[in-house]
């Protein structure tokens, strides 16, 4: 064993506190892998929260140190865009856009392409999870009414939302984290990410057009439309939300105003409403995701203090494997993202990346890897859950038949683009 790796291990043997920290870290990331802990009614957010509490409880960190471990700009940016997305959802924007696209008199391949484009574009500005939450019921009803293969359209929707969200530093939580921690410039990232994302959406469409030739595994004829009441389209509130979102994009692209501050101001403007009560808007904020971030920040910071993570990175470097290089980062990023999901994977890898180029690669890889497995992205699970309520069952095998080739294609496109 190399001296670099042996030293931290000797420290752990001599200090039970550090051994306990490592044990807490292992249990927390086991929970990230399993989606909870066996025999306990805990999801990933609950596991992360209890991990943070345990770290403070054993005296590894004071409450003040735990608070400093949380990257507040990321939390504030996440919260602010949850408010913006809530405004758009309450205004019926997502449902109305999807309904209008579904009503277009297009042949099946072109309709599929239109839905992929819309889902990808919306996810680049708003949360991919929210986009899937709003679009899935409409797309499911479209498939039932037109007798289209729902697996192709719904898995395509999830993949498009994931791919599209990689285009900007506000498209998904892990990109917000990477952009905030590494201080990536919004416009610079956009110009680097837009080509592989655009080509990735095109590759997704091409593969789905090919995949739809196979016989459908769902008997669409036996399905009936579930007429639930979507939000009523409110032009004024939608215009208000779009105006704030557009203003924020301009600020991000052309000014140096901190993104989290600008986003908070935008969220504050939206909360000044005579139509939507603030408590109603806050009800659409994903508090569990914020808790997940806070808990993982604390647990990861405690683990970093043991020196094990730095020693592991040094050991890899001594064997010619550098995390900053695209090859190892792609392999480790894809593997971790599908083991523990993309947000925890990003939080593990991010402290060891020092260059903007590595940050861009991680943002793209961790997001695109979410299409591989059904559990690789929350957006995938949202689509499957809402489809089930319409009587459409999508299992992990059906997802993998589309997700595997799409992930391989999009990662290959990204690798070629970044290596140019």
Roles of regions detected by a PLM:
Residues 126, 131-138, 182-185, 360, ...:
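Alpha-helical transmembrane segments of multi-pass membrane proteins predominantly involved
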Residues 205, 331-334, 338, 345, ...:
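Helix-loop-helix junctions within the multi-pass membrane cores of secondary transporters/permeases
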Residues 142, 146-214, 220-225, 359-362, ...:
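Membrane-core helix-loop-helix motifs of multi-pass transport proteins
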Residues 54-57, 179-186, 270, 274, ...:
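Interfacial segments of multi-pass membrane proteins
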Residues 64-151, 287-358:
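Membrane-embedded alpha-helical segments and adjacent helix-loop junctions characteristic
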Residues 1-86, 195-201, 205-308, 402-420:
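Hydrophobic transmembrane alpha-helices of multi-pass small-molecule transporters
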Residues 85-86, 106, 118-128, 159-168, ...:
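Helix-loop-helix module between adjacent transmembrane segments
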């Amino acid at each position: 064993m190399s001296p670099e790796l042996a030293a931290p291990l000797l420290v752990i043997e001599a200090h039970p506190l550090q051994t306990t920290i490592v044990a807490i870290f292992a249990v927390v990331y086991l929970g990230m892998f399993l989606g909870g802990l066996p025999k306990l009614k805990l999801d990933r957010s609950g596991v992360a929260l209890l991990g943070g509490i345990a770290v403070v409880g054993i005296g590894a960190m004071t409450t003040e140190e735990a608070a400093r471990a949380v990257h507040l700009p990321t939390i504030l940016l996440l919260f602010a865009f949850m408010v913006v997305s809530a405004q758009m959802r309450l205004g019926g924007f997502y449902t109305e856009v999807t309904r209008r696209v579904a009503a277009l008199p297009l042949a099946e391949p072109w309709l599929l392409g239109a839905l992929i484009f819309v889902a990808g574009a919306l996810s680049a500005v708003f949360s991919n999870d929210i986009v899937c939450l709003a679009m899935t019921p409409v797309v499911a009803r479209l498939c039932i009414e037109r007798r289209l293969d729902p697996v192709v359209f719904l898995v395509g929707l999830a993949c498009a939302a994931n791919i599209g969200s990689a285009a900007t530093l506000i498209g998904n939580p892990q990109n917000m984290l990477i952009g905030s921690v590494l201080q990536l410039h919004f416009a610079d990232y956009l110009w680097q990410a837009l080509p592989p994302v655009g080509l990735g959406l095109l590759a997704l469409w091409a593969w789905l057009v090919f995949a739809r030739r196979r016989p459908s595994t769902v008997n669409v004829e036996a399905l009936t439309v579930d007429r639930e009441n979507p939000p009523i389209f409110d032009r004024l509130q939608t215009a208000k939300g779009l105006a704030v979102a557009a203003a924020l994009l301009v600020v991000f692209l052309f000014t140096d105003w901190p993104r989290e501050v600008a986003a908070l101001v935008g969220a504050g403007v939206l909360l000044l409403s005579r139509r939507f009560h603030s408590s109603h808007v806050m009800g659409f904020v994903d508090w569990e995701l914020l808790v997940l971030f806070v808990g993982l920040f604390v647990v990861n910071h405690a683990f970093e203090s043991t020196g094990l993570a730095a020693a592991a990175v040094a050991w890899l470097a001594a064997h010619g494997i550098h995390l900053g290089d695209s090859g190892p980062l792609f392999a480790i990023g894809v593997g971790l993202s599908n083991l523990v999901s993309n947000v925890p994977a990003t939080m593990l890898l991010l402290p060891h990346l020092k260059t903007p180029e590595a940050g861009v690669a991680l943002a793209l890889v961790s997001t695109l890897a979410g299409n591989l497995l059904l559990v690789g992205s929350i957006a995938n699970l949202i689509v499957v859950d809402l489809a089930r309520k319409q009587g459409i069952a999508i299992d992990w095998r059906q997802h993998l038949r589309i997700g595997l080739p799409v992930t391989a294609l999009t990662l290959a496109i990204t690798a070629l683009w970044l290596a140019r």
